[in-house]
Curated annotation (Swiss-Prot):
Cysteine pairings via disulfide bonds: C42-C56, C49-C61, C55-C71
Name of the protein described by the UniProt record: U4-theraphotoxin-Cg1a
Organism: Chilobrachys guangxiensis (Chinese earth tiger tarantula)
Function: Probable ion channel inhibitor.
Signal peptide range: 1-19
Similarity annotation: Belongs to the neurotoxin 36 family. 01 subfamily.
Length: 74
């Protein structure tokens, strides 16, 4: 009796593990890329760039100190 219950629990565990592993695979069509998430909230050239929002396009956040960074061209 105990062996039967143990075998059933083992099979159930394997089935749940396989189902979880298959569902964890992500499809690129279902995921949003970072530029799509931040669309409309990017910082333009010459503006201060805080950590919360990225610079628009190919601009980079550069400056002499962390508090004086601005979005500039690379």
């Amino acid at each position: 009796m105990n062996a039967t219950i143990f075998a059933l629990l083992l099979l159930l565990n394997l089935a749940m593990y396989n189902a979880a592993e298959q569902s964890s695979e992500t499809d690129m069509d279902d995921t949003l890329l970072i530029p799509e998430i931040n669309r409309g909230r990017c910082i333009e050239e010459g503006k201060w760039c805080p950590k919360k929002a990225p610079c628009c396009g190919r601009l980079e956040c550069k400056g002499p100190s962390p508090k004086q960074k601005k979005c500039t061209r690379p």
